[in-house]
Amino acid sequence: IISIGLLQAAIVATGLGPRLTEIILNISDGSLIVTALLAVVAATLLGMGMPTPIAYLMLAMFAAPAIITAGAPVLGTHLFLFYFAIKSGSTPPVALVAVVAAGIARANWWSTSVAAFVHSLPGFIVAFMFLYSGALLMQGDAIFIVMAALTASVGVFAMAAGIQGWCVDW
């Protein structure tokens, strides 16, 4: 809690906070996908040294306005940012969660962190779908919610099967 207060005070005092949204929107030229990718980079950087709740709060203060301005729904934006604040612990370059797991298993930390990243790839795609489909967040008509859930499930299954090398002989 103390670190977020200090970091927020430093960002607000320097004027970087309000400008960060402007900088992200200028780089992305208002494109939702580019804005979201820049937010993923920010989430990864913040997740390297901060606990997940603090990283999410920083993203919510400074990256969420840019994503919402680019056209994403508010609920989808915050779920997207929270998801990537969590995922930053299992993806390289730091992959703190994977490194700890490798230490417990007495395995190679780099191969464990790469495996963690590869196995979480379907989740990265689903997180981007939160920004484009409110149906995945149970918003909208029931038929669209069911169709979105089915197509997302099939997509995640297909990616997971492809990553694992299953279903090759179909």
Predicted regions and their residues:
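Core transmembrane alpha-helical segments of multi-pass membrane transporters/permeases
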Residues: 1-16, 32, 36-45, 49
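Membrane-helix interface "capping/anchor" motifs
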Residues: 45-55, 164-170
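Alpha-helical transmembrane segments of polytopic integral membrane proteins
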Residues: 4-7, 13, 17, 60, ...
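Hydrophobic transmembrane alpha-helices that form the pore/transport pathway of multi-pass ion
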Residues: 52-85, 94-111
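Alpha-helical transmembrane segments of multi-pass membrane proteins
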Residues: 32-46, 71-87, 111-122, 136
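Hydrophobic alpha-helical segments embedded in the membrane of multi-pass proteins
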Residues: 33-41, 58-62, 76-79, 149-158
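Membrane-interface helix termini and inter-helical loops of multi-pass transporters
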Residues: 11-27, 134-144
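Juxtamembrane and boundary regions of transmembrane helices in multi-pass small-molecule transporters
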Residues: 83-169
